[in-house]
Amino acid sequence: HNRGRLCMANRYRISDLDFVYISYMEPNKEENWADLKNKVPWAKRVDGVKGFDSAHKAAAETAETDFFISVDGDNIIDETFLLQTLDFEKTDRKAVHRWRAKNIINGLVYGNGGLVGWDKETCLGMHTHENAKDKKAEIDFCWTVKHENLHNCYSTSVINSEPFQAWIAGYREGVKMSLN
């Protein structure tokens, strides 16, 4: 399989890209990893890396393709995502590409927890969260790294497999919604 090499004038099949599963302490991470490997047998994994920036850099180092898809440890992908293409004539290849996810608790569909496409150089060159060089970058990628927000939903964010996981997710959402 020649993943990531098939380019039709800046169009890439999602199924030709590396997928990197990023897990840390999600209580459902092993179940979700098994689900991903069933759907995406070539998926790779980064587990237990402390810090958002560091974990994403580890994912970029693990990916063998120049552009890769990250899947959070609490995310379940929809197999139809593998049938999609990404057209870099319509988006900025160097930007972070974020697809929406369905929040399993409230049914809302939005960017948080969704699948993310990363240009390897962009990911390795960013300084966010624990490695941030300014206050805005400490909060989230979206404040300092260019984003392409894509409006299709290809996954479900399963953030309620244990009560504490649901509480953490809700707290994070509340804090982010209160920011300007």
Name these PLM-found stretches:
Residues 4-62:
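N-terminal anchoring/stem segment of glycosyltransferases
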Residues 27-28, 77, 105, 124:
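Flexible, glycine-rich phosphate/dinucleotide-binding loops
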Residues 80-82:
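Acidic donor-diphosphate engagement hotspot in glycosyltransferases and nucleotidyltransferases
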Residues 1-4, 85-180:
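Catalytic-site signature of metal-activated, phosphate-bearing donor transferases
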Residues 68:
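Short aromatic/hydrophobic "clamp" motif used to bind/position activated sugar donors
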Residues 72-76:
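The conserved acidic donor/metal-binding loop of glycosyltransferases
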